[in-house]
Amino acid sequence: IRIATELMKKWHITLPDPDLSYLPEGTPEFDEYIHYMTWAQRFAMLNREEMMERFLTELKYSVREFKEVERINSHHNFTQRENHFNQNIWVTRKGAVKADIMDRGMIPGSMGTRSYIISGLGNKMSFNSSPHGAGRKMSRTKAQKQFTMADLEKAMEGIEYRKSEVLIDEIPGAYKDVDLVIEQSRELIKVDYVLRQILNCKGD
């Protein structure tokens, strides 16, 4: 943000708030940022692929027969070049996923609620985007103060998970209602499958 603020002064660009400062396209600073950003996004994708491969390898030890039907790569908090309204622009999706026509995605709930496999409807007014999940309705600190282990055990009844106070801030009650999120996204996506939690893996 410091470099962007300096560029605003250099280019005599006036903004209502310094936090809105940006890197003008065509500058060396912009090109460098895009280079490292795309590298990081590629790195993240390869990490997801590696995690999936390891998960499937471990699954073979406990489930004798299974068939991988489809692999969905749905990332959020990313930027890419797209064409919207006959203009090539950079679209940043923060807390959102790409939901162009028939784009496959996943909208997860919390560690104890349902998740949804979806297909995009290509809503132009949303720049072909949809929510990426339920999202928090309270901070981790507030959740730790408000909920107890008894609350967590009740919310996670019927789901296998690691019982630890460390996970209290991930309790379903700290998140928005994912079913309501799906309902409010009906112009952006269509639901293909509804997934029910049976096992939760969460690190410290």
Region roles according to the model:
Residues 1-204:
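Domain-length cofactor-binding catalytic modules of enzymes
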